[in-house]
Amino acid sequence: CHYKFDKFIEEVKSGMSVIINALPAEYFAKDHVPNSFNLYYKTIAKMSVKELGEWFSEVIKLHYPKLATYIQNNKLQIYEIPIVTYCAHDKCNASELAIKELMKKGFVNINEYSGGIVEYRKMIPVDK
């Protein structure tokens, strides 16, 4: 599923979806959506299912208290967590490749914000 800007912002604010920037770390360091986490698609490909599950578990434990509660109460498994990926812009395919890699590892609830950081910054400029 491809999210439009408004739906993406809704997901970011909800605290109920893990927001993943699928670009290399140097691009993430230059600019990223607040409250998103860098997980380059090539890194996902190299991680084992166990490592990826542990990575998401740690991020959720530290930054997503609502999701952590659902997991603790067995209402949600780690591989069912809502994830939204994004990359640079609508011509970039890193977020799509991240989705494919996540699905190969058993994650089932993944969406994409295809506008990427370029569209995001058009809508929400950086304060100078």
Placement of each model-derived feature along the sequence:
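Mid-length scaffold segments of soluble, non-membrane domains
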Residues: 18, 22-51, 55-56
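Active-site neighborhoods of enzymes that stabilize oxyanions during catalysis
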Residues: 122-128
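Catalytic cysteine-centered active loop of the rhodanese-like fold, especially the PTP/DSP P-loop
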Residues: 55-120
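Short coil/turn linker and secondary-structure boundary residues
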Residues: 3, 44-47, 115
